[in-house]
Amino acid sequence: MSRVAKNPVKLPAGVEIKMSGQQLSVKGAKGALELNVHPSVEVIQEGGELRFAGRNGDQQTRAMAGTTRALVNNMVIGVSQGFERKLQLVGVGYKAQAKGQVLSLALGFSHPVDYELPQGVTAETPSQTDILIKGVDKQLVGQVAAEIRDFRRPEPYKGKGVRYSDEVVRRKEAKKK
């Protein structure tokens, strides 16, 4: 059995799990998420925890059980606590402003960049140079953060651009004459 799949997923209070066929749905205080479970993975609910096992013992099935366990664990954390990703804008005149489901960015281009946030993700701007992306789906929150960062990646000479708050930008020295 996969070492990841051996650990059960503990269900905190207020989180509901419903299994219908291969469809697993998780409901919590912050929202609801669904996952199509691979047919070779067996999901067993025992009391306040979920266990995952492969229907047969081959390598691929064990790997799929571990992957499913990790995805369901992220779903449980998402609907109970939520996920967030912080971005920083570094550069003169770089600004961000959240207006509903649209994030307006001034990133040194001749035009403002308007990013439409997908359903289930919200953005806050505590200051003009900080962006806080929140949601229940870990993959979607990370994807949105990566797409916003791709508008203007941090460049290695001055470090200007959009970066994750915990990112360390490798700097280069300018060419010498």
Swiss-Prot record:
Entry keyword set: Ribonucleoprotein, Ribosomal protein, RNA-binding, rRNA-binding
Coiled-coil spans in chain: none
Cited function: This protein binds to the 23S rRNA, and is important in its secondary structure. It is located near the subunit interface in the base of the L7/L12 stalk, and near the tRNA binding site of the peptidyltransferase center.
Assigned protein family: Belongs to the universal ribosomal protein uL6 family.
Entry's transmembrane regions: none
Key word Ribosomal protein present: yes
Record-given protein name: Large ribosomal subunit protein uL6
Taxonomic superkingdom: Bacteria
Gene name for this UniProt entry: rplF
Taxonomic source organism: Stutzerimonas stutzeri (strain A1501)
